[in-house]
């Protein structure tokens, strides 16, 4: 299969993902692995643009090289329901999962209502993030939100964070993993891509049935702005990450498309080495 100037060898998801493909319990996890295999990319772009034009421009540039877009719908200054619907339709046509990083934290009943509301997150998101601080009912509430509109989605629970001084301590992480791995509505967990040792421990605790997605990675390893730390993308995948979440490393690059392709190559290399 010829894609631009790059020769892409077709591979079945089962061959690329090994045990993760066999053990995955979430339909959305299978969908993600299919898209990632097709694009040979374990990259989710943190699409932190605050205008609709900026989001469309970014999606067009990086779409072939990323498997998902992480959005913050409430950051968009000129948001409208019509423009957002057009954006989401284009994203899905480009084989991009839409991951709304809402970080829900309330009780299940309220979270279900928040999936509706002015942004109607339930109608376009494939994945959302949540804290488990209010208990497992939050996952039931979020899944009920998707059920209300006849859609399927997955919840990513925050088990670790990559920012300095965060309060997600090991005991909390352990409880999140214990409760999350037992819940069918949980797609997976957010881990810390900047610390491979912590990520390896998280993968051991999680097992193969759930995804681990990780921010905190950059081809330029080190400290970033506002307390962020960065680890190497390939190392993160080798340590157990199933998707690297990349923001400024792509959208602030002179050529976002080329940057996305570089991250895709680094992530795919890690997956093949991990399962090789």
Region locations from a protein language model:
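Alpha-helix-loop-beta-strand connector modules within alpha/beta enzyme cores
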Residues: 83-102, 202-218, 267-273
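Glycine-rich phosphate-binding active-site loops on the catalytic face of alpha/beta enzymes
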Residues: 126-134, 233-259
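Hydrophobic faces of well-ordered beta-strands that scaffold small-molecule active sites
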Residues: 41-47, 69-71, 98-102, 128-130, ...
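Conserved N-terminal beta1-alpha1 strand-loop-helix module at the mouth
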Residues: 4-99, 106-107, 168-188, 194-197, ...
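Histidine/acidic-residue-rich catalytic or RNA/ligand-binding cores of hydrolases
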Residues: 112, 225, 255-259
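Conserved anion-binding
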Residues: 105-201, 205-209, 220-222
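C-terminal helical cap(s) of enzyme catalytic domains, especially alpha/beta-barrels
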Residues: 4, 237, 249-276
């Amino acid at each position: 299969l010829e894609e631009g100037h790059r020769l892409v060898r077709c591979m079945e998801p089962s061959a690329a993902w090994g045990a993760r493909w066999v053990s995955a319990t979430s339909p959305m996890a299978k969908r993600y692995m299919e898209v990632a295999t097709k694009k040979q990319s374990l990259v989710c772009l943190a699409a932190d643009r605050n205008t609709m034009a900026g989001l469309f421009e970014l999606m067009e540039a990086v779409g072939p090289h990323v498997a998902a877009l992480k959005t913050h719908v409430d950051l968009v200054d000129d948001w409208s329901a019509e423009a957002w619907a057009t954006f989401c339709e284009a994203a899905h046509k480009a084989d991009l999962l839409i991951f709304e990083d809402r970080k829900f934290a309330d009780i299940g009943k309220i979270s279900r209502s928040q999936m509706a509301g002015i942004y109607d997150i339930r109608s376009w998101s494939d994945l959302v993030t949540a804290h488990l601080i209010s208990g497992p009912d939050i996952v039931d509430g979020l899944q009920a939100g998707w059920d209300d509109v006849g859609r399927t989605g997955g919840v990513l629970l925050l088990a670790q964070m990559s920012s300095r001084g965060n309060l997600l301590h090991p005991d909390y992480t352990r409880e999140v993993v214990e409760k999350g791995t037992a819940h069918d509505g949980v797609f997976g967990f957010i881990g810390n891509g900047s610390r491979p040792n912590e990520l390896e421990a998280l993968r051991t605790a999680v097992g193969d049935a759930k995804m681990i997605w990780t921010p905190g990675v950059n081809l330029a390893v080190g400290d970033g702005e506002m307390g962020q730390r960065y680890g190497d993308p390939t190392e993160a995948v080798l340590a157990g990450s199933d998707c690297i979440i990349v923001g400024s490393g792509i959208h602030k690059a002179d050529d976002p498309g080329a940057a996305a392709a570089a991250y895709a190559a680094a992530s795919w290399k890690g997956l093949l080495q991990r399962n090789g």
